[in-house]
Amino acid sequence: MKSNKRNNRKLRIALGICIPLALIIAATLTVVAKYGPDFGLYLVPPSAERYGKDALATIGKNGIYSGSDEWKSTYEECLKMIENAESYEDTYPAIKKALSVCGGKHSILMTKSESQSTSDSYDEVLPTVSLNGDIAVIKLPDFLGTAEAGRKYAKVAEDFIHENRDKINGVVLDLRGNTGGDMGPMATAVSSLLPDGELMYYHYRSYDVPVTLKDGVISNAGTGGKSPYPDEKLKVPVAILTDGMTASSGEALTLCFRGLENVKTFGAPTAGYTSVNMLYSLYDGAQMYLTVAFDKARTGEIFKETSIEPDVATDSPLEAALEWLRS
């Protein structure tokens, strides 16, 4: 009798464990089934049509132009384009069309091989720094790399400013050719030139998200970053150089300085990719870069994929910047 009671007790304990576990598994499967397609996750491989429809749904839910009349008609066209799709690749034309209309010119689709090729071909380029008399010249290139590479990138400019802080009476920040990438290391590199607070904003359809600097920590900018010199602020004039290749995060960094005293831009209008992309991975490894927000300056100006005009348009921006800084 005692043996039966012990067995019954063990059975009740086992069932008590199994039932909550089953509920957890069921809940997990429900979540994956509902939200997984947004991240390329499925319980079973999707059909080509399902794959395409889910991609279009993600674009329509998050794209910056999803409320436009053009998108409404384009969405129906894209659905028809994937009706007879036999492979995931067959849906790519419809996805690309949807991205261009609902996401704008900054949005793209990259196949798995294209994404891998881009990653493999990226050459790490570090900032270059120098002193021109009492003027610091800092050139920040585009950046796309690991967190460790980002810290290495930022450290070049951070250490240079720290070591020469008593000599520097002005800064040239050269963003020409900076096509973007991860803004975190870029902003961290020059955080000593920026005041703590909200630097710029990502302007979504119904709300804003600020890029912030506090105690040396950059937040909401790519991978972010933390300066080893949070208390050091170099309050000197800053001249920013831009050209037609200054794009995306390069433009966002330019806007971090917009509206500040003793800041002036020189050169040519930027590329006009003043928007924020979100990465969505698809089931087959393809990646959608979808524009979900515009850049907004602390001045309240919203840049809807428009160029940032320089304060001084010139073919000799470095010379003009040095002249201004020394005047």
PLM-predicted stretches and their roles:
Residues 65-133, 327:
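Extended, small/polar residue-biased N-terminal targeting/export presequences
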Residues 127-153:
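STAS-typified acidic loop motif
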Residues 55, 98, 138, 173, ...:
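Terminal peptide-recognition signature
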